[in-house]
Structure formats: structure tokens, C-alpha cells
């Protein structure tokens, strides 16, 4: 089962929490969910060059707090904060609440699965050899402390007439282990031969305590890198 399911969805409530954090009754739930979808669509469209990996939406009383996880926070903020003010106004037009936008810097984008997948997709669009792009991403992740990484590329790779799937793995990626801290990201490359799909799994270690916020806490403390299992056992 762990081989097929989205590893983030499988671990929700165990060592990973939701990206939309709010409660609503039946009357408002659909409206707020639709607002979340529109907010994410607009932000991803406006911040294509900002390397946005994740958008977290929280709704305290009569407010909407949006946290943007980006590898290039300067692009999000803009000159003297002009760009972020425009984003705040656009989000405020969608929702009737007061909008607060926070930005979290991703210090090691090579260890973020979404950013790695998008980087490979961009290289495929520039006609870089897919094996070279995959190998370069794997080496960068392992050098910066990942315990394992797996990359799948599928489609008409290299302009081949028959679509196929190629994969590359280094280290261990235990998809069945629920305590494993596994990041997962997907991206699509729009090439002249058609679309190519990219999937990335990055194993950053094990989270021994049962805490849905554990992954977020470790990313904020360690810049995207989880402590090794040995150091966690010593601390316990």
C-alpha cells in the first residue's frame, strides 16, 4: 500500500499536518474550500519564479493567515514590499477576511521534493538529458544530508516515439514505514514531444515521537534537514 499511495496523505496526523488548517460547519465548508483552491491557484501563478514549495492556509477568527514556503523570499516580497502588498490585496478580494501573509525561507531547496521535481521539469523543457538531470538532483540531495532519494520520470523521454518510465534511486526510501520523514513532490514538464511527469521522494530520517507538527518544527529549526535517527535516540 505504501508503494502506491501519496506518502504525505498516508502520514497526515502522524508526523505531518494538513496544509489547510481550519474548521467550518456544513454551510461554510464548501465556500472556504473553494477559496483555498483559488488562493493557491493565484499564488502559484503569480510566484512562478519564486520557487514556492508549499502554501499553508490558516483561518483564525475573521482572519486568513497564508504562509508561503519559498526558496526565494526576496522575489515574493518585491522591492520595498510592493509585490507582497499586491498579493495581499488579490487574496483579500477572494476572501472576506483580514489577510496576513507570512513568508518562510527554505534554506536547502535541494532537500525539498516539490522544488527538486520542478527543477527537473524545467531542465527537461530546456532539453537537458533526463538522466543527467536526475543524477545531478540525487547527488545534490545526498550531499546535503538526505538519507535516501528516488526520482521517477515518465513520458516521451528524450523524444522517444514510445513513452516509458525511468527511475533513479540512492540510499533508502522506506515508503511503508509510517515514522519515516518522507517528502514527496510532483511536477509536469511541457516539452515539444508532449508532457513528461516527474515524481520525487526524499527520505530525511525517522521521527520517533507521535506529533503531527514534528516535520514542520524540524524544517523550521534545521532549515529543511531532519536530524539523524541516531541523534534522536541519544536525545531520548
Curated annotation (Swiss-Prot):
Residues 213-236 are annotated as: Disordered. One of its GO terms (biological process) is translation. Residues 39-107 form the KH type-2 domain. It comes from the Bacteria. The keyword Ribosomal protein applies. The keyword Ribosomal protein applies. Pfam families: KH_2, Ribosomal_S3_C. One of its GO terms (cellular component) is cytosolic small ribosomal subunit. Keywords: Ribonucleoprotein, Ribosomal protein, RNA-binding, rRNA-binding. One of its GO terms (molecular function) is rRNA binding. InterPro entries: KH_dom (IPR004087), KH_dom-like_a/b (IPR015946), KH_dom_type_2 (IPR004044), KH_sf_prok-type (IPR009019), Ribosomal_S3_C_sf (IPR036419), Ribosomal_uS3_bac-typ (IPR005704), Ribosomal_uS3_C (IPR001351), Ribosomal_uS3_CS (IPR018280). Part of the 30S ribosomal subunit. Forms a tight complex with proteins S10 and S14. NCBIfam families: rpsC_bact (TIGR01009). PANTHER family: 30S/40S RIBOSOMAL PROTEIN S3, SMALL RIBOSOMAL SUBUNIT PROTEIN US3C. Binds the lower part of the 30S subunit head. Binds mRNA in the 70S ribosome, positioning it for translation. Belongs to the universal ribosomal protein uS3 family. This is Small ribosomal subunit protein uS3. It comes from Bradyrhizobium sp. (strain ORS 278).
Amino acid at each position: 500500500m505504501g508503494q502506491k499511495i501519496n506518502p504525505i496523505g498516508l502520514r497526515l496526523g502522524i508526523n505531518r499536518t494538513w496544509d489547510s488548517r481550519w474548521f467550518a460547519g456544513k454551510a461554510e465548508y464548501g465556500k472556504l474550500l473553494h477559496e483555498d483552491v483559488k488562493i493557491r491557484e493565484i499564488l502559484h501563478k503569480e510566484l512562478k519564479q519564486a520557487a514556492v514549495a508549499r502554501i499553508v492556509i490558516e483561518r483564525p477568527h475573521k482572519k486568513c493567515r497564508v504562509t508561503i514556503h519559498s526558496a526565494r523570499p526576496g522575489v515574493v516580497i518585491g522591492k520595498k514590499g510592493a509585490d507582497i502588498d499586491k498579493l495581499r490585496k488579490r487574496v483579500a478580494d477572494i476572501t472576506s477576511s483580514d489577510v496576513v501573509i507570512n513568508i518562510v525561507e527554505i534554506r536547502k531547496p535541494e532537500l525539498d521534493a516539490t522544488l527538486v521535481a520542478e527543477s527537473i521539469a524545467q531542465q527537461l523543457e530546456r532539453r537537458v538529458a533526463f538522466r543527467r538531470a536526475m543524477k545531478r538532483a540525487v547527488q545534490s540531495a545526498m550531499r546535503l544530508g538526505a538519507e535516501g532519494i528516488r526520482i521517477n520520470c515518465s513520458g516521451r523521454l528524450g523524444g522517444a516515439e514510445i513513452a516509458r518510465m525511468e527511475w533513479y534511486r540512492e540510499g533508502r526510501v522506506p515508503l511503508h514505514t509510517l515514522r519515516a520523514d518522507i517528502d514527496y513532490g510532483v511536477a509536469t514538464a511541457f516539452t515539444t514531444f508532449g508532457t513528461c511527469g516527474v515524481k520525487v521522494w526524499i527520505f530525511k530520517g525517522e521521527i520517533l515521537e507521535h506529533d503531527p507538527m514534528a516535520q514542520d518544527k524540524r524544517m523550521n529549526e534545521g532549515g529543511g534537514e531532519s536530524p539523524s535517527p541516531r541523534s534522536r535516540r541519544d536525545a531520548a
